[in-house]
Structures are given as C-alpha cells and as structure tokens.
Amino acid sequence: MLLITPDELKSYSVFESVKTRPDELLKQDILEATADIILKVGHDFSDAEYIPLPETVRLALLKLSQFYALINGDESIIKGYTTEKIGDYSYTLGDGSSLQKPDVYALIKDYVKPADPDLEGIEAKVRMRSI
C-alpha cells in the first residue's frame, strides 16, 4: 500500500538522483519507509480517520522515502569504496557516513497507538529443547 506516490517524492526532493530514479525503484523506497513508519506507530493508516493522510505523516514518509532512495541508489555505499582512480582521472564517492536516517518521531508521535491494555500483565511460558 503506497501512502505517497513516486511523483510526490520527486517533487519534494531536491536531489537529482532521487528525481531521476525510476518509479519502480521509488515505489520500493516508499514501501520501505512505509514499513518503518507502520512499525513505529503500530497501525497502517488504513482507518477512515486517516483519509486524507495527515500532513505530518505525509512529510515523515517523504523524508524517509528520500533517505531510502539516496541510500539504495548510492552504489559506492554498497560496494564499500570511497575513491576510485582510472588512469589520470580520480574521484571520491560518499561513504554514507554523512547521510543519517532522519528522525521523524516528532512528526508521527501523535499517531502512535498504545499497546493493548488487555495484554498487560499476561505471562507466557515457552518450553524449548535443543535439537
């Protein structure tokens, strides 16, 4: 379920690498960001009260999606190199250390659902045996 579109992400971002990234890859980045937000808030924004999607949640999704698009699109991070030399030509690539995952908690904190109070205080015992 996409809560934002690749076109919305492209118009939000100032990074050329995000704007030129194929829509199919941006959809994967958006899904990754959506899964991250759902994990933090405890629901998937499918209830009628979240239509339209709150602006702060939308902004959080845009920020995280842009982050994932930048990380997933940076070949130098995956390959693990920072400099490369070809003949007389050399260049330096980012190592990802300056790119940090944005903290979007302040944007989504109003939408975090508390744990089910019926589950509090329940004990469970698990028996395990070695194989």
Swiss-Prot record:
Pfam families: DUF3199
Organism domain of life: Bacteria
Name under which the protein is recorded: Uncharacterized protein YqbG
Organism: Bacillus subtilis (strain 168)
Subunit and interaction comment: Monomer.
Entry-linked InterPro entries: DUF3199_YqbG, YqbG-like_sf
